[in-house]
From Swiss-Prot:
Disruption phenotype: Mice are healthy but males are infertile; spermatozoa are morphologically abnormal, most lacked tails and malformed heads. The lumina of the seminiferous tubules are filled with cells in different stages of spermatogenesis and are sometimes necrotic. The cytoplasm of Sertoli cells contained vacuoles and appeared necrotic. The Sertoli cell barrier appeared disrupted. This is Plasma serine protease inhibitor. Keywords: Glycoprotein, Protease inhibitor, Secreted, Serine protease inhibitor, Signal. GO terms for molecular function: acrosin binding; phosphatidylcholine binding; protease binding; retinoic acid binding; serine-type endopeptidase inhibitor activity. It is found in: Secreted, Extracellular space. It comes from Mus musculus (Mouse). GO terms for cellular component: acrosomal membrane; external side of plasma membrane; extracellular exosome; extracellular space; platelet alpha granule; platelet dense tubular network; protein C inhibitor-coagulation factor V complex; protein C inhibitor-coagulation factor Xa complex. Residues 1-19 form the signal peptide. The gene is Serpina5. Transmembrane segments: none annotated. One of its GO terms (biological process) is spermatogenesis. The reactive center loop (RCL) extends out from the body of the protein and directs binding to the target protease. The protease cleaves the serpin at the reactive site within the RCL, establishing a covalent linkage between the carboxyl group of the serpin reactive site and the serine hydroxyl of the protease. The resulting inactive serpin-protease complex is highly stable. The record marks S372, A373 as: Reactive bond. InterPro entries: Serpin_dom, Serpin_fam, Serpin_sf, Serpin_sf_1, Serpin_sf_2. The lineage of its organism: Eukaryota, Metazoa, Chordata, Craniata, Vertebrata. Belongs to the serpin family.
Length: 405
């Protein structure tokens, strides 16, 4: 049996350098993003169902992943899947083959890739894929054509008979696409591999208004009610998008980036993490974005870096995507070889959140001013485990849980 894995790479870097070049309309648009703009029609609930599956696999650990990258990888795989396997993939994404949503899925990703390739001031966002295949294995021309046309995928001839050379070629590609942040991603490779599909998303953004390094101090973070650890805590008093969700017991704070992106930080009430996680769905997200109001907050947010790697072949079956990782999978649309099997689907993600330098913060100042006496601010401290989601326009790029900053 010959094998091929799918590798999903995610890199998120948030820098707090501020800028005044963006208009109020762009800030307002980021705040008021609706769930449903042009793009792939995969259910937003897929992001949260996958989140809950990953949490169950890693209890008490940090969680960070890109539902966009995972769904795009599954979309590419569905191009070459037979009816039963394809139906499982689409059902897992919350779509229906009978309703003609497969074409909308592929065309949606095509539109998204085209839009993400357009330069955006203050925001670096790249999404793409590549296929590395052994020249001895014939891949169907219509599959390669669809990968190129719909997913703008690069295709490389790779000598898997020499694992060291193949590993170096793929790792060099990964390092280039992630701007050197992910190196030596593939550590083990052998001659049974005949094809590797890589999907990556790279995000680097600046806050619209910076945190000042002089306001960052060590504070206690309560990992559990009985365990605390010291973490660098950023602080900025300013106007933020704010909503208190009493239905599922959490506080939501929206912090805009340049380039029409926004990060939502979700702080469950004490002892209510499970209740909040169970309540995460598309309707909840839409309600938060709709109900946001501007509120002056004295915000404390950890400066943190997290990294996660997942073997999705252990997780996706919980979402109903089962056959694709077994010998029952029908991948005849990819190759005529009957002894080729999808061996694994690895998702690696990294996230760094930090404040800007003092100079940048001093140049920027606050983006909200008040004519009358300065109103009192509400103090919100992210000093216990919290959730986050990052959106660009209506698209959920990342979802995470910070348990140990």
């Amino acid at each position: 049996m010959r094998f091929f894995p799918i590798l999903c790479l995610v890199l998120f870097i948030s820098h707090g350098v501020a800028s005044r070049r963006h208009s109020h309309s762009k800030k307002k648009k980021a705040k008021e993003s609706s769930v449903g703009a042009v793009g792939p029609p995969s259910s937003k609930d897929f992001a949260f169902r996958l989140y809950r599956a990953l949490v169950s696999e890693s209890p008490g650990q940090n969680v960070f992943f890109s539902p966009l990258s995972v769904s795009m990888s599954l979309g590419m795989l569905s191009l070459g899947a037979g009816l039963k396997t394809k139906t499982q993939i689409l059902d897992g994404l919350g779509l229906s083959l009978q309703q003609g949503q497969e074409d909308k899925l592929h065309k949606g990703f095509q539109q998204l890739l085209q839009r993400f390739r357009q330069p955006s001031d203050g925001l670096q966002l790249s999404l793409g894929s590549a296929l590395f295949k052994d020249p001895a294995v014939h891949i169907r021309d219509d599959f390669l054509s669809a990968m190129k046309t719909l997913y703008m995928s690069d295709t490389f001839s790779t000598n898997f008979g020499n694992p060291e050379i193949a590993k170096k070629q793929i790792n060099n590609y990964v390092a280039k696409q992630t701007k050197g942040k992910i190196v030596d991603f593939i550590k083990d490779l052998d001659s049974t591999h005949v094809m590797i599909v890589v999907n990556y998303i790279f995000f680097k953004a600046k806050w619209q208004t910076a945190f000042s390094e002089t306001n960052t101090h060590k504070m206690d973070f309560h990992v559990t009610p009985k365990r605390t650890t010291q973490v660098p805590m950023m602080n900025r008093e300013d106007g933020y998008s704010y909503y208190l969700d009493q239905n599922i017991s959490c506080t939501v704070v929206g912090i805009p980036y340049q380039g029409n992106a926004i990060a939502l930080f979700i702080l469950p009430s004490e002892g209510k993490m499970k209740q909040v996680e169970d309540g995460l769905d598309e309707r909840t997200l839409r309600n938060w974005l709709k109900m946001f109001t501007k509120r002056r907050l004295d915000l404390y947010l950890p400066k943190f870096s997290i990294e996660a790697t997942y073997k999705l072949e252990n997780v996706l079956p919980k979402l109903g995507i089962q056959d694709v990782f077994t010998t029952h999978a029908d991948l005849s649309g990819i190759t005529d070889h009957t002894n080729i099997k999808l061996s694994e689907m690895v998702h690696k993600s990294m996230m760094e959140v930090e404040e800007s330098g003092t100079t940048a913060a001093a140049i920027t100042g606050a983006i909200f001013t008040f004519r009358s006496a300065r109103p009192s601010s509400l103090k919100i401290e992210f000093t216990r485990p919290f959730l986050l989601t990052l959106m660009e326009d209506s698209h959920i790029l990342f979802v995470g849980k910070v348990t140990r900053p």
